[in-house]
Regions:
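Conserved glycine-rich "GG(E/T)P / GGGxP" loop and the immediately following alpha-helix
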Residues: 2-13, 21-163
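Helical H-box/DHp helix segment flanking the catalytic phospho-acceptor histidine
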Residues: 17
Length: 164
């Protein structure tokens, strides 16, 4: 199959403790993390490094921070020049979040890749997350000053005042 300007979307977990009322996956969560077999690694390596893949988006039908081991394994499959995206609520404490950002930065810099961290700013998540990651993440990305890592926010909310 020839890929052309393709988005490769990989769900790495079905574990989530947030329990958003809008979530279409809540009743389907198996509470399992993806495990990469050798065959899966080879298939993903081929897909990730295919010249027709524009971006590799890592998320979950849950919170992908619960499966960082596999996320880092996937990053390491790159042959270089891959644009990754990590979609998360960023619910962990700030110290752990900074450690995650630094680990991602180290891997992508060693491979010659880039990674955009997309933090949720859904009001459903904000109400349930004790460690608000948004302001902290903005500060850390300014300090990090890494041209290969970027930060963005995503929301399903239509309340523009909330997402400002």
């Amino acid at each position: 199959m020839k890929l052309d300007n393709h988005l490769l979307y990989i769900d790495i977990t079905q574990v989530c403790d947030i329990g958003c009322s809008f979530c279409m996956y809540t009743d389907k969560h198996s509470r399992e993390n993806m495990i990469l077999t050798q065959a899966a690694r080879e298939n993903l390596r081929n897909l990730i490094n295919d010249e027709g893949v524009k971006r590799v988006s890592i998320s979950g039908e849950g919170e992908p921070i619960y499966n960082l081991k596999v996320f880092k394994e996937i990053l390491k499959l790159s042959g270089g020049g891959v644009a990754f995206e990590f979609i998360t609520s960023g619910f962990v404490n700030h110290e752990r979040l900074l450690k995650i950002y630094n680990e991602i930065s180290e891997i992508i810099l060693s491979n010659g890749d880039s990674c955009n961290i997309r933090l949720s700013s859904d009001s459903y998540h904000i109400d349930k997350i004790p460690n608000k990651p948004h302001g902290f993440s903005i500060q850390q990305f300014i300090k990090l000053n890494n041209e290969f890592m970027s930060l963005s926010f995503r929301s399903i909310d239509i309340d523009k005042e909330f997402t400002r």
